[in-house]
Amino acid sequence: MDRFIFNRLWAAVKREILTILAEDVSTPEEIDLLWENMFQLPTSKPPCRLMDQIGLDTVALIEDNYIQERYLDGKLTVDWLRENYIQQGKFGQKSEHGGLYTTVKNSRAAEEEIFLLDVGLGANNPDMSTIATAGQILKFTPSSHSIETLVSGQSLPDGIDISQRASRMFWTNMGRSTSTHDGSVHSANLDGSDIKTIIPSGAVHTPKQLVVDDANQHIYFCDREGMGVHQCNFDGSDHRILVQTGLLDHPEDKDDMTRWCVGIAVDPARGYVYWTQKGPSKAGKGRIFRAEREILAGETASNRSDIELLLQGLPEPIDLELDRKNQVLYWTDRGEHPVGCSLNRISVAGDEIQPESKEILARQFHEPIGLKLNTKNEVIVADLGGSVYRVGQGKTVILENQVCYTGVGLQE
């Protein structure tokens, strides 16, 4: 039986490789390199474990695209997956019901690793002359309360997200100063090795929050002083501006903080991108928008007609997080108390958003920035005051020190 299964697996792999070569999509050398990076590294997972890690709903979405492009029958692939797993709430590691593997870890803390960005402004860095390169990527493990430095020497890092599919982290650096046009975007393995520059220094102004679209292998990020919403592939190719709220060569635009784009979230299934424009500090002029991911024919990033204003008059909205399953949008706000320095949410399930339905989930943060929703529907929040919180039934401090935290990534 084992030999029979091996023969079927190997035959399927060979058929797909030969098809790729016949269509001149890749080369033998590139295919072998991809195979080694996907399945033969010490951190690599076998295929079924990898699908559970990625999420079976994401696997189904990727397969839907492939079936549509190739005119294939999905009965024994994605249809079977949805009927036997997804529709039963079995999404993989992120689900309490498991996935292809039915065993679910009992300890929440043991399966949770929190990736944190130390922007370099805190008292943990005694030499303020080194701030421009004092940024770090840290990994915090709640079960052991241990902190590991993965990457150092970064220039004001701000946004980070994890690709479960590629087992890599992606992050933004604002640059040596927020006033200089020298921002950049990078990626690395989850242990901090194999650092790659995705968007080189100077190609963007001040990149802020970044999110990963694993299904399409895209990253999205906002450029604050650059006044835009950006998209590119995992390797930095096909870099596009989706939304442009002002022009750098117009001083009146650059100085208008209501044009500054900061937080971002993406919904691949519905085809939306969400973003915040925070406004001046503590000014109550913050807004949240959304638009289609694809620009309509005949339009540009600067004159899009499909941009929806969802919320306005917010204290100072910063980063976003979308619960795609339940269609709930979360955001941090670093505005003035009592409604600022808060964690908030609103339903975006319908075509029309009801502003009066927004909720404040927790208050009294110290300049909150990054946030991530975990598999228990708890929100991990990090703030510039040096604390990391878990917000569920209540608000709990899970880490406190003299670091200024910005972005948050999560591996479960």
Where do the language-model regions lie?
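NAD(P)-dependent Rossmann-like dehydrogenase/reductase catalytic/cofactor-binding core
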Residues: 1-108
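Short loop/turn segments immediately following beta-strands, especially the blade-tip
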Residues: 232-234, 291-300, 346-353
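An edge-strand/N-cap motif at the start of beta-rich repeat modules
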Residues: 106-148
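Short glycine/acidic-enriched loop and turn motifs that connect beta-strands
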Residues: 121-125, 175-179, 226-228, 279-283, ...
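Beta-rich, blade/repeat-based domains predominating
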Residues: 108-112, 123-126, 132, 154-167, ...
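A short beta-strand motif characteristic of beta-propeller blades
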Residues: 145-151, 194-201, 238-254, 305-311, ...
